[in-house]
Amino acid sequence: MKLEWLFLTIAPCDAAEPWQLGFQDAATPMMQGIIDLHHDIFFFLILILVFVSRILVRALWHFHYKKNPIPQRIVHGTTIEILRTIFPSIIPMFIAIPSFALLYSMDGVLVDPAMTIKAIGHQWYRTYEYSDYNSSDEQSLTFDSYTIPEDDLELGQSGLLEVDNRVVVPAKTHLRIIVTPADVPHSWAVPSLGVKCDAVPGRLNQISISVQREGVYYGQCSEICGTNHAFPIVVEAVPSKDYGSRVSNQLIPQTGEA
C-alpha cells in the first residue's frame, strides 16, 4: 500500500485532480513552454509586488500624520518621473518577447507531418479519422469515441473523463490534428499537451503536436455546445515500435465491426 501511494505521488499528472491549483505535467514542448513562460512572468510579478509593497509600507510608516503633522509638499520630481516611466515600459518588453516567440511556435504548421488525425465534434461525441490509413473513399480507419457512463466504469477509470475508444498516437512523433465540427462549435483541448483548438462549423483548423512520453492524457471540450458540452478527450501515447500493432489490434477491428 505504501509503495502504491508513493507511485501515485511521483507519477506524472496527466489528468485533473481534486483541488488542483497548478498545471498538469507537460508532455509536449508547447506545454513546457507555457509553464516556463508562466513561471517567468510570475517572477516579475513577485518582484513588482515586493517593490510596491515596500514603498507602500515605508510611506505609511515614515509619513504618518502623528510624525508629520505638516507634510512637505513635493510637486515635481524629474528623477522619479523618469524612473516610473522607463521601468514600467521595460517590464512588458521582457514579458512580450518570449510570449510572441511561444505564440508563433504554437501556431506553426508542419509541412510534412508523420501522421494526420482528423477529429470531428458531434453533440456529444467525437469521430476520429486516421487519414494516413485510408485505402479508398469508401474504406477508412474511422471510429467514434463516447463518454463511458459512470455505471459502466471499471476500477481505475476516471468518471466523466474516460471514453470507450481512445486516440492512440505514437510517442516522439510529429503529428497533425485537424479539428472540425459536424453541427455546432466544439473544441479539442488537452491540457497536458498544451493544445486547445476550436472547431468552427464550415472550417478546418489544425494543430501540431509531438508527445514526448508515453502515457494517457485527458481533456474536455471547452466550448459550451449544449447539455453535455464537457465530453472528454483521451489521447494515449504508445512507443513507436508498438504503435502499428496497437492500431491493428484495437482500432481496426472496431472500425470493421462498425
Curated annotation (Swiss-Prot):
Keywords: Copper, Electron transport, Magnesium, Membrane, Metal-binding, Mitochondrion, Mitochondrion inner membrane, Respiratory chain, Translocase, Transmembrane, Transmembrane helix, Transport. It catalyses: 4 Fe(II)-[cytochrome c] + O2 + 8 H(+)(in) = 4 Fe(III)-[cytochrome c] + 2 H2O + 4 H(+)(out). GO terms for molecular function: copper ion binding; cytochrome-c oxidase activity. Cu cation A2 binds at residues 221, 223, 225, 229. It is an enzyme of class 7 (translocase). Coiled coil: none annotated. It is found in: Mitochondrion inner membrane. Its EC number is 7.1.1.9. Its cofactor is Cu cation. Mg(2+) binds at residue 223. The chain crosses the membrane at residues 40-61, 86-106. It is a multi-pass membrane protein. The keyword Calcium does not apply. Component of the cytochrome c oxidase (complex IV, CIV), a multisubunit enzyme composed of a catalytic core of 3 subunits and several supernumerary subunits. The complex exists as a monomer or a dimer and forms supercomplexes (SCs) in the inner mitochondrial membrane with ubiquinol-cytochrome c oxidoreductase (cytochrome b-c1 complex, complex III, CIII). Belongs to the cytochrome c oxidase subunit 2 family. This is Cytochrome c oxidase subunit 2. The lineage of its organism: Eukaryota, Viridiplantae, Streptophyta, Embryophyta, Tracheophyta.
